[in-house]
């Protein structure tokens, strides 16, 4: 609400905090005072996280679509994120489902790697996104326009011809969301990296060998 970038997964507070209300309708002070379920910690700002990590590990930051329709109403959050990253020296990359957001990031912080979060976009899975927009986004047409270097695609759709096209052109392929070692093993036959939850994935080689 006050132009500060917050680190939080959902649009609504209920699932992760037990509180009511939309994140976008709260000030950063209110959100930092809102305790996460099972924790004494409040919702952190992006600056809080950057200060804590301080380059110790790479960060992949997803910028959430703000209007629920993948529309062109972007700018404020992207500016806030770019400002927080001005003096950050650690490894970081940015991504979003909304190609307008990724395009804005290409202008605001052109030296930071960026990518598109992608999906087959069945309209039944995206009821707030217009059918026409779903049809367009399913083809991943904005990769070049946004000067992306990777996509993060639905793990259930990695055999998509659109994903194969980008991989053949040199794009790095990430995927979401992997929920078991069995799914991970299958995904890694094609994907360069994964987003996982609900189990402990093996440490990447570069971490294990430190």
Write out the residue ranges for each language-model feature.
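C-terminal active-site rim and adjoining tail of enzyme catalytic domains
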Residues: 117, 124-210
